[in-house]
């Protein structure tokens, strides 16, 4: 018996043990059989193709694939990397402690030697009253001149990905190529910025105002704004733009499954490793993709949501991309042809 499948060189997924005691992934052995390769890939001992007939495995239908060998090697390599401390990070932490801020301080690559934040080009400096402090999102915050009583969140010319382009419509300040701060005539340069009402040192994530199921997978790919409250002047309710940003952030955490129709009733889930490749191509907006399934080339059409073996378009099957709750509404018999019995069934 080996620790890896010598066909795909990964940890065996739904392992099949041959008479010679060597183990392989179910999908790898099935592909070997469909290509008339009936010898063990390790010792070359012949095996009977009936070994996979009506094969079942006690695995979770929604489970992930075993951790790949390459993942373990990358983790070990990462541990061996010697990372030197960031001087700016240490300086920011010291300044934060002096101001009584005990929160975790993020790296501040746009802080100069005097502790002032500036833009990515370093052409402009902005006076601050909270040097080295960060908000709950881990990016610097500062209070501008007293004649400009708005709190600005600033990180060079960038923002955390799920807050970019948000919160620009509160207050009387709008985005400009070179905004002038009222009262101190200081330019921030060609940068993006967020504007918050007085007293708001960064907005909370708007999770409490979004109607959600107890599970994240109830958040669909275009929604996320159910139960939204209408913002009013001076209200703490985030704007529609912020809801859109938060909705997209929630969608990024949703897990999707890929199914293909059985020849009879029901559905099969794709092998988890194949599923990951399919999802990556789908998210890349590819109209179709070609991949090997069971050792044979298949075409997956994301427009018609069909798959077929290359060269045999007439024998197509339907495919689906579903959330966890949608998965439960389908009769999923197993994974890639391997039955997963219901161990709780009582006759």
From Swiss-Prot:
Residue ranges of the TM segments: none
Superkingdom of this protein's organism: Eukaryota
Zn finger (RING-type) location: 5-44
GO MF: poly-ADP-D-ribose binding; ubiquitin protein ligase activity; ubiquitin-protein transferase activity; zinc ion binding
Gene Ontology terms describing biological process: ubiquitin-dependent protein catabolic process; Wnt signaling pathway
Residues of the WWE domain: 244-321
Keyword Metal-binding: yes
Keyword Zinc tagged: yes
Gene Ontology CC terms, in alphabetical order: cytoplasm; nucleus
Keyword line: Metal-binding, Zinc, Zinc-finger
Pfam families, A to Z: WWE, zf-C3HC4
PANTHER family according to UniProt: E3 UBIQUITIN-PROTEIN LIGASE RNF146
Protein name: Uncharacterized RING finger protein C02B8.6
Organism: Caenorhabditis elegans
Organism classification: Eukaryota, Metazoa, Ecdysozoa, Nematoda, Chromadorea
